[in-house]
Amino acid sequence: METTSANFTQNDSNVCTNLYNHRGWAQYFLPAMYSLICIVGLLGNVLALHVIWPNLKKINSTTLYSANLVVSDILFSLALPLRVVYYARGFDWPMGEGLCKAVALLFYINMYAGVNFMTCLSVDRFIAVVLPLRFSRFRKVQKVRYICGVVWVVVLMQTLPLLSMPMTNIEQSGHITCMEYPNFEKIDNLPVMLIGAVVLGFGIPVITILVCYTALCLKLRHLAKSNKLTEKSGRSSKAIGVICTVILVFVVCYSPYHVDLLQYMIKKLRYDPDCSELHKFQISLHITVCFMNLNSCLDPFIYFFACKGYKKKVLKLLKKQVSMSFSSVVRTSPEGSSKDVFGNDKIQMNSRSFQKERSSVLLNSLEQ
């Protein structure tokens, strides 16, 4: 039986009364973490957008996917202050059902958009380096715009149904919880739905990303072995290092939450977990969701170290700010022509061997 009061839903559950007994440490740890994620994520992604925006006319596939990822991260960061207030109040939401649904919508949009656009980026890099001729048409800007549009439509189809679900619940303690797992427990076939969401929203994308980047690493290792100049320059090693960093960030941020969710849903299909197990799951969810949200503030750092053009433009911007502060002129060398904001170095054809030219082209494609 359910009763409603002041736009909030109250479940008639007197079974579990200890689900938020960890609020003592959570109301300090979670606000601190989310405040850090909000500040770093917002500043980093706004800076990334500031670098990308003036160069939209020179945009290419990599930049376009990255721009969509940046927009998603910014929208998510703007909603985090409300979550900080919620956690600081000890899991108590004072802002109504409507705002709770809006914050939940932005949270899940960011999660699915982040996974999908990271997958698109991995496939884009795979095509650029491993299959540059056969599938190059899928890297044309016009087609990539359509792909981005389809991704957003799919993400909205995945998340908009949340607006029809109750997001808040009045606990026996009087606290009003928002976007907590127990608030969804009365949804029919919830374990099956969430297992399907984990497989489609995380399992398939992570396999795609691992396959694409593994193929990239193998290709780069082959290029380094067949071209001593490339191996000596260290460019292939740097590229492989960047790829490993991207994979590590993705796996560390997204895997704990989805693995945690998957194991508990499988457990629910077998039997009904008791209050102790549900409480442990609640604690693990709060921690793993926090890790997953770290991804939004780590993306700008990946752009900085992975993309030469982005790094150069950020450093130039910082030098400009320093020069203005100290009323001094810092002269920098003019930038060469660039295909896009992430700096696709112009390849100069010369009389060197074909293998060296091919290695340079593929490595430059990876650094876009």
From Swiss-Prot:
Keyword Magnesium: no
Record topology, Cytoplasmic segments: 54-73, 124-145, 213-238, 308-368
Positions glycosylated per UniProt: N7, N11
Keywords, comma-separated and alphabetical: Adaptive immunity, Cell membrane, Disulfide bond, G-protein coupled receptor, Glycoprotein, Immunity, Membrane, Receptor, Transducer, Transmembrane, Transmembrane helix
Transmembrane domains' residue ranges: 28-53, 74-91, 102-123, 146-164, 190-212, 239-262, 283-307
SUPFAM superfamilies named among the record's database cross-references: Family A G protein-coupled receptor-like (SSF81321)
Subcellular location: Cell membrane
Extracellular side: 1-27, 92-101, 165-189, 263-282
Cystine pairings recorded for this chain: C100-C178
Family annotation (InterPro entries): GP183-like, GPCR_Rhodpsn, GPCR_Rhodpsn_7TM
Record GO cellular component, one term: plasma membrane
Any single GO BP term: dendritic cell homeostasis
A molecular function GO annotation: oxysterol binding
Membrane association type: Multi-pass membrane protein
Task performed by this protein: G-protein coupled receptor expressed in lymphocytes that acts as a chemotactic receptor for B-cells, T-cells, splenic dendritic cells, monocytes/macrophages and astrocytes. Receptor for oxysterol 7-alpha,25-dihydroxycholesterol (7-alpha,25-OHC) and other related oxysterols. Mediates cell positioning and movement of a number of cells by binding the 7-alpha,25-OHC ligand that forms a chemotactic gradient. Binding of 7-alpha,25-OHC mediates the correct localization of B-cells during humoral immune responses.
PANTHER family to which the protein is assigned, alphabetical: G-PROTEIN COUPLED RECEPTOR (PTHR24237), G-PROTEIN COUPLED RECEPTOR 183 (PTHR24237:SF7)
Family, similarity comment: Belongs to the G-protein coupled receptor 1 family.
This protein's name: G-protein coupled receptor 183-A
Source organism (scientific name): Danio rerio
Name of the encoding gene: gpr183a
